[in-house]
């Protein structure tokens, strides 16, 4: 595990605006992505993740102009994902200003994409973004299923097994998002974090369910190297980032 726990605001972007819903549905406007990125950068965020949440479902490319403007305002690592399908997409995003690129749907459809990207750019630029949900499907031994297209399509693929395979293919980080917990603000899915941590040494970013600063330390204790949230930061008090870091610090974790 890394020495310092990273705290990462997530900007889910639809048509140039930050949105947030519950369980990936009923999206509501949360503001301008460039302004929010600027605010979080000033407030002490360690990184920012930018996800074009409709790119994979509507078959359109990531909004490059928004990425460019965001990168100009942010002086911390910026991860960008949504609609990334090819090595060329990764190259363009890195040239646009992204420090890291996340893949989701396209990697599930063609796992070789992970290998191709890491061979060209290195593992450090690639984040596997995984939207997982609980399932009773006997084909998913862990009890978690990989979903694609913004959580709208089930795959029948075991989420923990997929994390193991992606790690073996060279992915640099795994962004582990619980669809069941997403937007509920009731806490992270600790069992899922523990199960994935048991099969990989790749850094894990816990996502989905944060509702108060006290939810973050248990995620780190379960095995997360970084913690990510959206609605808590978008709709919470201006000092929420500081509160989260204080909670982590008080629980004995190192933060920047």
Curated annotation (Swiss-Prot):
Biological pathway: Amino-acid biosynthesis; L-histidine biosynthesis; L-histidine from 5-phospho-alpha-D-ribose 1-diphosphate: step 5/9
Reactions catalysed: 5-[(5-phospho-1-deoxy-D-ribulos-1-ylimino)methylamino]-1-(5-phospho-beta-D-ribosyl)imidazole-4-carboxamide + L-glutamine = D-erythro-1-(imidazol-4-yl)glycerol 3-phosphate + 5-amino-1-(5-phospho-beta-D-ribosyl)imidazole-4-carboxamide + L-glutamate + H(+)
One term of GO molecular function: lyase activity
Domain of life: Bacteria
Keyword RNA-binding: no
GO process annotations (BP): L-histidine biosynthetic process
Keywords for the protein's UniProt record, in alphabetical order: Amino-acid biosynthesis, Cytoplasm, Histidine biosynthesis, Lyase
Localisation: Cytoplasm
One protein family per Pfam: His_biosynth
UniProt xrefs under InterPro entries: Aldolase_TIM (IPR013785), His_biosynth (IPR006062), HisF (IPR004651), IGPS_HisA/HisF (IPR050064), RibuloseP-bd_barrel (IPR011060)
Subunit structure: Heterodimer of HisH and HisF.
Record-stated family: Belongs to the HisA/HisF family.
Function, in words: IGPS catalyzes the conversion of PRFAR and glutamine to IGP, AICAR and glutamate. The HisF subunit catalyzes the cyclization activity that produces IGP and AICAR from PRFAR using the ammonia provided by the HisH subunit.
Protein name: Imidazole glycerol phosphate synthase subunit HisF
Provenance organism: Micrococcus luteus (strain ATCC 4698 / DSM 20030 / JCM 1464 / CCM 169 / CCUG 5858 / IAM 1056 / NBRC 3333 / NCIMB 9278 / NCTC 2665 / VKM Ac-2230) (Micrococcus lysodeikticus)
Gene (UniProt): hisF
